A protein has these predicted regions:
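N-terminal, polar/charged subdomain of small-to-medium soluble alpha/beta proteins
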Residues: 1-90, 96-108, 112-151
């Protein structure tokens, strides 16, 4: 299992190799990409912030839950932090299983659970302003903690 929160670029090949197993007939990969618009507004860039140790712990819990729930052979969950430009990968999820149906289902579930539960916050930056727009629902936080809002 590969779990990482990092300011470094995410490498899909690393994740694929991490989950590849002889007994796995399928590998599914999801890349979350920074897009140039959101809700009709032009996005300049995004800034992701996290509590890395807590985020990795929660990512591991979610990945372990997926392994059992979907009978996976392995999984990888990687999330970027820091400033990300348009077109860069913010989230990488890879899963492997004996058959493709399990990987499709598990990948979808895993991405949704990571976005819902993992303490990572996203700030959207536009030409005329910025706003923290996402955080984990499970912590009851609508925006980043005060220590992160100043960045």
């Amino acid at each position: 299992m590969l779990i990482r929160v990092t300011p470094e670029r995410l490498n899909p090949e690393e994740a694929i190799e991490a989950v590849r197993r002889d007994e796995a007939g399928a590998v599914d990969v999801f890349l979350g990409i920074v897009r140039n618009t959101n809700k009709g507004r032009a996005v300049d860039h995004l800034v992701y912030d996290a509590y890395p140790s807590m985020a990795e712990k929660t990512m591991r819990e979610v990945a372990e839950e997926a392994l059992e729930r979907f009978d996976l052979t392995d999984s990888a969950v990687l999330h970027r932090t820091g400033r990300l430009e348009i077109g860069e990968t913010s989230l990488l999820v890879a899963v492997s299983a004996g058959h493709r149906a399990a990987t499709f289902e598990a990948g979808h579930w895993l991405v949704n659970e990571v976005k819902r539960r993992v303490p990572v916050w996203k700030k959207e930056v536009w030409a005329d302003g910025e706003e923290w727009i996402e955080g984990p629902e499970s912590l009851g936080m609508e925006r980043a903690p005060a220590t992160m809002r100043g960045s």
